[in-house]
Amino acid sequence: MAQAEVLLTKEPAPQSIDVCELPQKKYEVACNTGAYTSAGLATAGFRTAKYLMDEWFQNSYARYHQAFADRDYSERQRHESKQLAAETGELAYRTQLDSTRRVGERLEDMHCWKSELQREIDELSSETDQMMAQKLRLQRALDALSVPFSIATDNLQCRERRQHPDLVRDYVEVELLKETELIRNIQELLKRTMGQAVGQIRLNREHKENCEINWSDKVEVYNIDDTCARYTNESTQVQFYPHSSKFEESASTPETWGKFTQDVLLRAERERLASVNLRKLIDCILRDTAEDLRLQCDAVNLAFSNRCEELNDARQKLQYHLLKILSEITDQEHQIAALKQAIKDKEAPLRVAQTRLYQRSHRPNVELCRDNAQFRLMSEVEELNMSLKVLKEKLQDAEQALRNLEDSRMSLEKDIAVKTNSLFIDRQKCMTHRNRYPSVLQLAGYQ
């Protein structure tokens, strides 16, 4: 009855029969206990075991009244039960309809969040793939840097084999040192960027996994709620679960439930945007480093070209002077031969003059006269000795000049050999090796 009173929502309908007390009719019955009754003392014991008529009527009326009351109560209870059944049926219908609507709303919310999570998962997956591609570009760029670094170091080592006086710290060496330093700095930068890319990929995968876990939970819940929404009173799978109406202690509230998913999406979106920014930064780094390397490579090539022109010009000048020296050596050798011949030519007249003087010194007595012939012979000998002295001095000077010319020739030939060796190193060794320098696409990691 207590449950029925709780479920009633309006006053009971008016009864078909008004509830009232039965009329109490009094009947006058003659008593057999008077002084002049015909009953004797012999009937005194039988009267005590029988009801009086008044009691009989009272008993009948009591039965009527009880039957009427029970019937009336039964009718009221039947009416109230019918009304209660209708009301509870209506209430159960409305409650079930509202529950189904609420479950449907929950399904819509779940579908919305599930779609957002799916979108974020797809975007994170795409972003991670793009970041992996950027990481691959970084690795390719790092691998490509080994070629220019080996070229630059090989050029420096080859140029160490230049000979004196070409073993100088020229602008080619300065540019090569700049190139090696630039390559080292770029390698360090790309390695640090590679570490950042690897860390970002790991974060992307972690947040993608969080989104996938949340999405998987929501798919499971969506299927559960979808199944629940399809249950009807005619469903055969439903049964009683008395303890299912209790709230779990670990159950979340709608606010915490929504905030949890929103936080997961916000963190994933934040990491995805960070990944996008890092990917753009990597693209700029690879483009700028590739351009810087190619500019430095062009600067080194230009320095090599200018230096080779200088060396070739110096060698041509040395060869020109060598030809002049060789020509002068030939002329000087001819001159020395002429001087020697001139000296030789003076020996015969000197012998003649000295012999004449010697023979005339044997003139006897007064014939040993200092005549003009004697004076002339003496002056002739003196002139011839003076000529021989001058010619011998000139011969010595010519021979010294020839020795100087030979030294210059050897020095020029050595310098020409040094310049030829330097040209061979710079042009054949270094510049030919630099033709293997990677392209901009290779340095940018595209190939």
UniProtKB/Swiss-Prot annotation:
Keyword Amino-acid biosynthesis among UniProt keywords: no
Source organism of this protein record: Rattus norvegicus (Rat)
Cysteine disulfide partners in this protein: none
- Source domain of life is Eukaryota
Per the annotation, which location comes first and is thus the protein's main one? Answer: cytoplasm
Coiled-coil positions are: 114-143, 324-348, 375-423
Query: Is Metal-binding among this UniProt entry's keywords?
Result: no
Q: What quaternary structure, including any partners, is listed in this protein's UniProt entry? A: Microtubule inner protein component of sperm flagellar doublet microtubules.
Annotated compartments: Cytoplasm, Cytoskeleton, Cilium axoneme; Cytoplasm, Cytoskeleton, Flagellum axoneme
Modification after translation? Ubiquitinated, leading to its degradation. Deubiquitinated by USP16, promoting its stability.
Q: What is this protein called?
A: Tektin-4
Query: Could you tell me what this protein does?
Result: Microtubule inner protein (MIP) part of the dynein-decorated doublet microtubules (DMTs) in cilia and flagellar axoneme. Forms filamentous polymers in the walls of ciliary and flagellar microtubules. Contributes to normal sperm motility.
Keywords, A to Z, come to: Cell projection, Cilium, Cilium biogenesis/degradation, Coiled coil, Cytoplasm, Cytoskeleton, Flagellum, Ubl conjugation
Q: Which Gene Ontology BP annotations are present?
A: cilium assembly; cilium movement involved in cell motility; flagellated sperm motility; regulation of brood size
Q: What does the sequence similarity comment in the record state about its family? A: Belongs to the tektin family.
Q: What's an example GO cellular component term for this entry? A: axonemal microtubule
